[in-house]
């Protein structure tokens, strides 16, 4: 029995002589054994907390823009393509709503509020296929959506892809690009957007079996299936190559939104064969150039069977349930693209020339001439920058060395005849 003045541990009651160390304070004492016990309890608590933190809840409390809000934001950056914007806005909204629901269900504290019946419903992923001519805005739409939602974005060209084991990029390289875009934050990458362009260029070479392996056509389509529907990709760290005894980064693609796009040149003919009767004789329907529907109008009627005839495999089409067709841009739309969006080309050049202390002006006739040139080149909006760049090359070379240059005027002759812009 300890005497009244013998110091005791305030928690276990042991005397100083019974423990290695007793730390004294004004009103209480604690021994080394109780300190070790408390340390173990805190460590166990931290481990439990870490288990809960493995559940990604980044979308649970995030405000998701409605389809109308997404469409309105797209209008600020992309001209025209109203039908495609609407389809994209709905598909993207449903995709991230699905992500929000799955994260809420994974969070134990929320499960009770949702109910057992709802918890049994599994929402499928709605990947997107964009069909439209070169320069119609497919890539820009995908990039803009990723920026608006603040999610990582990666882009790949389907023509560079080959089956794993062959020279070229394999499908896992696309996931690696997304991981790099998210600074190797796996949870961020798993919620990103991947855009695969030129998907039409990997169509099957034909229905007849071939003795040579089609490693960049149907083979790549087969390889893309798992990525699109959801798989766990093993990615080497920091962009290196895989090798034995290497620790790989596991990335689940189940929640990555996949958007694929292509020009699909000739698809309009496939659709026309399906939708219009053709024949020879007195009662045959004769179609002429004047009354035939435009290619973009036919693309609006695309059906999965048309894509199968074009050369995409049915399994791939089945994993791309959202089809959106973009129309070819006319001259008026190209002029709007030059001037109206937030990052319009004319605004960009005005900013560049402002930094040199000069104000650049494009006449209406100059803008029309730029649009006409782009139409003639059949490059759509993609060709606008090169036309303006060529017209202003000499001016941008000379201007930084000129003193007191205040205005630069670009008129129709500058675009069509290569005349030097007026500088005053």
From Swiss-Prot:
GO biological process, one term: cell division
Domain spans labelled ClpX-type ZB: 1-50
Keyword Zinc-finger attributed: no
Protein name per the record: ATP-dependent Clp protease ATP-binding subunit ClpX
GO cellular component, one term: HslUV protease complex
Chain residues that bind Zn(2+): 9, 12, 31, 34
Entry keyword set: ATP-binding, Chaperone, Metal-binding, Nucleotide-binding, Zinc
Listed NCBIfam families: clpX, PRK05342.1
Similarity annotation: Belongs to the ClpX chaperone family.
Organism this protein belongs to: Psychrobacter arcticus (strain DSM 17307 / VKM B-2377 / 273-4)
Its biological purpose: ATP-dependent specificity component of the Clp protease. It directs the protease to specific substrates. Can perform chaperone functions in the absence of ClpP.
GO terms, molecular function: ATP binding; ATP hydrolysis activity; ATP-dependent protein folding chaperone; protein dimerization activity; unfolded protein binding; zinc ion binding
Subunit (UniProt): Component of the ClpX-ClpP complex. Forms a hexameric ring that, in the presence of ATP, binds to fourteen ClpP subunits assembled into a disk-like structure with a central cavity, resembling the structure of eukaryotic proteasomes.
Record InterPro entries: AAA+_ATPase, ATP-dep_Clp_protease_ClpX, ATPase_AAA_core, Clp_ATPase_C, Clp_protease_ATP-bd_su_ClpX, ClpX_bact, P-loop_NTPase, Znf_CppX_C4
Pfam families: AAA_2 (PF07724), ClpB_D2-small (PF10431), zf-C4_ClpX (PF06689)
Chain sites annotated for binding ATP: 133-140
């Amino acid at each position: 029995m300890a005497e009244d003045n013998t110091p005791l541990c305030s928690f276990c009651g042991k005397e100083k002589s019974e423990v290695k160390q007793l730390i004294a304070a004004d009103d209480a004492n604690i021994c080394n054994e109780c300190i070790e016990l408390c340390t173990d309890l805190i460590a166990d608590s931290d481990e439990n907390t870490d288990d809960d933190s493995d559940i990604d809840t980044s979308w649970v409390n995030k405000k998701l823009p409605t389809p109308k809000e997404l469409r309105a934001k797209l209008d600020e950056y992309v001209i025209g393509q109203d039908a495609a914007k609407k389809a994209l806005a709905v598909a993207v909204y449903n995709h991230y709503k699905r992500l929000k629901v799955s994260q809420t269900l994974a969070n134990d504290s929320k499960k009770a509020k949702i109910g057992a019946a709802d918890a049994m419903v599994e929402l499928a992923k709605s990947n997107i296929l964009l069909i439209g001519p070169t320069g119609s805005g497919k890539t820009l739409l995908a990039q803009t959506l990723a920026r608006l939602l603040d999610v990582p974005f990666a882009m790949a060209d389907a023509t560079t892809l080959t089956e794993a084991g062959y020279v070229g990029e394999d499908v896992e390289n696309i996931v690696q690009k997304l991981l790099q875009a998210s600074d190797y934050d796996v949870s961020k990458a798993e919620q990103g957007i991947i855009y695969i362009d030129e998907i039409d260029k990997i169509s099957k070479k034909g229905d007849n079996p071939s003795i040579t392996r089609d490693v960049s056509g149907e083979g790549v389509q087969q390889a893309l299936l798992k990525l699109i529907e959801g798989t766990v990709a093993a990615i080497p760290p920091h962009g290196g190559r895989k090798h034995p005894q290497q620790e790989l980064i596991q990335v689940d693609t189940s929640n990555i939104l996949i958007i694929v796009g292509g020009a699909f040149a000739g698809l309009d003919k496939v659709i026309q064969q399906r939708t219009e009767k053709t024949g020879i004789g007195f009662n045959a329907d004769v179609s002429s150039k004047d009354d035939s529907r435009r290619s973009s109008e036919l693309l609006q009627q695309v059906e999965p069977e048309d894509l199968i005839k074009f050369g995409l495999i049915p399994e791939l089409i089945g994993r791309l349930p959202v089809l959106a067709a973009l129309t070819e841009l006319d001259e008026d739309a190209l002029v709007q693209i030059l001037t109206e969006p937030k990052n319009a080309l004319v605004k960009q050049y005005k900013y560049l020339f402002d930094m040199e202390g000069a104000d650049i002006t494009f006449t209406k006739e100059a803008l029309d001439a730029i649009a006409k040139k782009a139409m003639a080149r059949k490059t759509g909006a993609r060709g606008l920058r090169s036309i303006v760049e060529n017209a202003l090359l000499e001016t941008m070379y000379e201007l930084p060395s000129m003193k007191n240059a205040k205005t630069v005027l670009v008129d129709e002759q500058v675009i069509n005849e290569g005349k030097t812009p007026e500088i005053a």
